[in-house]
Amino acid sequence: MIKKNFLIIQKLGFILFNRVRNRSENSRLAALNACSRVIFLPTRSGFTLIELLVVIAIIGVLIGILLPAVQQARETARRMQCGSNLRQLMLAMHSHESAQRQFPAGYLSDTSRSDRDSNTLDAAPGTGWGLLLAPYLEEAAVADNFAQVKDPSQGVLHPANRSLVAQQFQFFLCPSSAGDQEPFVVKDISGNPLADGIEIGRSNYVANAGHEEPWGIFPASASWDAIANGPFYRNSSIRNKSVTDGMSTTVFLGEHTSSLSEKAWAGVIPGGASHPTHKFATRIGTAADHAATLVLVHSGPAAAETALYGYEVIHPPNSPASHVCQMYSDHPGGANVANGDGSVRFVSEFINQDVWQYVSSIADGEVISSGAW
């Protein structure tokens, strides 16, 4: 009886064990099947909206950091090209001085003519320093074709010179200039076109006439010896030895952007004027100035301005006064200038005004070290 009961209990235990084992196996298989379903479920790729916004924000920050650096690098390259243009012009200046035993005149004018301009005594031919440098700028054809050789009575105004004086040359244009780069119609002081609307090529480079207004003081004088103290003026003929203040500390050429006023490379048309552009035309103190300012600028102080304002006025580069007869560039912070020795430097718009006055004259006796400006 006991043995029989033991067998029954043993059999029941075996059945129970098998059921538990089967349930465990089924659970294990179910778990594996669930994992398989999770592992092999198809997934979707792409950005969430938040991730996309983060990426856009990062790109915006990078652009904000890099763009000013890129723009600064471009301006640096343009400023270097501008300086290279000035060096090329100064090399031609010294070639002219070597060949002709003098630097070119600021512009040529026969002040003895009866048809001279009554305000400034300007008259033909009006040939400017830029045109006089043509043979030394690998533009000998321009000089050869200039009708002044054939008929000096009209010079720049000669009908045969219309296409010649309207040409544009890259070495007369600053790549940073924001103004027009096309030829412009020469107008009188009131804004009326001269000489049947003759056009003349632009220049972003001007010569330094010194302290005084290039067209003179009241009354205008045929001989400028008493008032001209810069290297270039009407019928000037200075040589290296004329610059007793030192060639390395005397400004010969500088910038004048066409976004301020009209400047020409070929020369002066008697009775014409340099007019401010629309950007500056309404600024106080800005007005058209007489023909000489088409190729020349001054630093001040000038007798005419002192008489007008009651005090001396200096015009450093990029001066807020924006005088059409001053050096002015579209470079941030200042302008390039070329010294008599051919060196080019960038002059700050915050240069000491007395220093700027001193480096603008050729023989005022002031000694300026290169580090002073």
Residue locations for each model-derived region?
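N-terminal single-pass transmembrane signal-anchor helix
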Residues: 43-78, 88
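Generic alpha-helix initiation/capping and coil-helix boundary signal
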Residues: 23-27, 66, 284
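Surface-exposed loop/linker segments characteristic of extracytoplasmic
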Residues: 2, 65, 76-373
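A ubiquitous, low-specificity "background" feature that marks scattered single residues
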Residues: 24, 28-32, 39, 57, ...
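Detector for intrinsically disordered, low-structure N-terminal pre-sequences
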Residues: 19, 30, 37, 69, ...
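General helical secondary-structure elements
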Residues: 15-19, 24, 33, 40, ...
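N-terminal leader/signal peptides at the extreme start of proteins
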Residues: 1-49, 111-114
